[in-house]
Amino acid sequence: MGAQWKAKHRETAANAKGKIMGKLSKEIQIAAKSGADPDMNPRLRLAIVQAKKASMTRETLDRAIRKGAGLDGDAVQYHAVSYEGFAPHQVPLIVECLTDNINRTVAQIRVLFRKGQLGASGSVAWDFNHVGLIEATPASADADPEMAAIEAGAQDFEEGEEEGSTLFITDTTDLDAVQKALPEHGFTVTAAKIGYTPKNPVSAASLSAEALAEVEAFLEAIDEHDDVQNVYVGLTE
């Protein structure tokens, strides 16, 4: 839960998939602004990995790349913005957004933070590590995550979000190199991005059931906003 919070969606599978595709399309478009060739654009290459994992169609993927790179006209004008603050019960979080209207997004985020506390830039980021996050699954039964982390150049590793997966943590500048090296050491990369891990997370066990439910409800409301791409939370199980 500390690396990236994921909502326990109560919506239909179709609606959930639609939101995921919309967020992935935005990320591809903004990444493609730096070039449409994934071999020369690490951010785009990583976004494509995420899109393929989510079963985005080739047509949708190509359209997002062309739109972002401006190959069919003007390039898309999405802006990356982030917000910092606290969920109820002083649980720190960083919210990353992609938006075509910053004023609209900040106004809506302020409303969502009424049950928490929206902070100034830097008010929470100091309590997180800015890192590369690579989720990977073993390609064989004898794949060793510790050896793979050492050989591929990762800083650390821990259990991943998906069952049986490993989360490799890297320096931000090493993300692309490590995710390219992991297959040589027995792991298949399923997701890779620049993100955050908490330094001093709040323990969920220290919260009452009612308090934890309030935190979860707050985080789910944030995550469901159309402009929100990632939510990083200082909370451990």
UniProtKB/Swiss-Prot annotation:
Keyword rRNA-binding: no
Residues in the signal sequence: none
Gene Ontology terms: biological process: regulation of DNA-templated transcription
Keyword annotations of the record: Cytoplasm, DNA-binding, Transcription, Transcription regulation
Compartment(s) of residence: Cytoplasm
A GO cellular component entry from the record: cytoplasm
Gene3D superfamilies: 1.10.10.200, 3.30.70.980
Gene Ontology MF: a single term: DNA binding
Residues passing through the membrane, by range: none
Family: Belongs to the TACO1 family.
Name of this chain's protein: Probable transcriptional regulatory protein PP_2550
Organism (species): Pseudomonas putida (strain ATCC 47054 / DSM 6125 / CFBP 8728 / NCIMB 11950 / KT2440)
